[in-house]
Amino acid sequence: MTNTDGKVVQGSLSGDGSRWTLGEDLGYDKTYTVTGIATGADGRSVPIDGNFSTVSPDDEVNAMIAPADGEVVGIAESIIVHFPSKPENTDAVEKALTVTTTPHVEGAWAWIHHDGGWGIDWRPKNYWPAGTKVHVDAKLYGVEFSPGEFGAGDVTSDFTIGRSQVVYADANSYQIVIKQGCTAMKDPGSCRSTVATYDASYGKGDRSDSKDPNLVTRSGIHVVSELLSQHIMVGSPPYTYHSVEYWDARISVNGEFIHENPNTVGDQGNTNVSHGCINLSPKNAESYFKSALLGDPVEVTGTSVQLSAADGDVFDWTFPWSEWLNLPA
């Protein structure tokens, strides 16, 4: 087999000579020529001479995998294969995806709408074991995502799960507790050690003098999705503020961060006064920030509003495992 430039296409013949298998991907919208000699059932030689053309996509779609190659992430990090829009042929996409872990980890895929597009997320049943090696292989080249839309190429990622660290954030305690060596969800007793306990101030929306669900720190398993040493916090009306804050760990795209706030140090440890973020002192915020990894879980409890899909991008852990398995995938 040759392409339009006359270059031979790599391939191999089966042992019995009955089948020839491609050894490389064919290009889109290309013409190939096949020549050769076959032996018929009567033992006579039969010449082969013909050509064919490959599909011409209307659009070649690039997918991306997170975490990226070489990253070290926390024990609540999901694998996300990002698409600009949800493919119509989801079954074909799913068949092209494999996850290999060392050691073996139970998990499953589900289609989730993310800010800026769609993704198919692979979440483990429980938190990842520390030190797990993960290989993701998305053989998407040649896969038709939707009519006329084909995968632009294969993508892979090899990443590692780092040390096990969980932040336990009980809004009624006015503190956060950072533990390591944790092996189970929602179980501080499964952790090997307590790294630090810091006074904190949470969202004031549950207070009797300022009832407002928009100002409640959401309860549930959050995931650290961004680490910013400096960030401008801007409130939306009627909550107008514009301030530069330091040591910011984003835990939800609804605007929740763990960050320093020197203006609430007197309230930290005794009163919840924030707009929904978890406020720490400058010293404690810096210490926590430097210990954090993307993908670390932050388990918030003690508030009246639960984290949900309405709160943004990474909400995979809001689903019990039985519900996750029943999501479209």
Pin down the residues of each PLM region:
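Short peripheral tails and domain-boundary helices/loops at the edges of structured domains
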Residues: 60, 66, 165-173, 317-329
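A short, structured loop/turn motif at beta-sheet edges
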Residues: 42, 129-132, 218, 252-253, ...
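Sec/Tat-exported extracytoplasmic proteins
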Residues: 56, 87, 138, 163, ...
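Short beta-strands and strand-coil junctions in structured, solvent-facing domains, enriched
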Residues: 89-90, 144-146, 185, 208, ...
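Extracytoplasmic/secreted envelope proteins and their assembly/folding machinery
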Residues: 35, 49, 80, 94, ...
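Gly/Pro-biased beta-strand-loop elements
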Residues: 153-265
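Exported/periplasmic cell-wall-interacting domains
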Residues: 75, 231-329
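Acidic, low-complexity Ser/Thr/Gly/Pro-rich repeat segments typical of extracellular/periplasmic
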Residues: 1-163
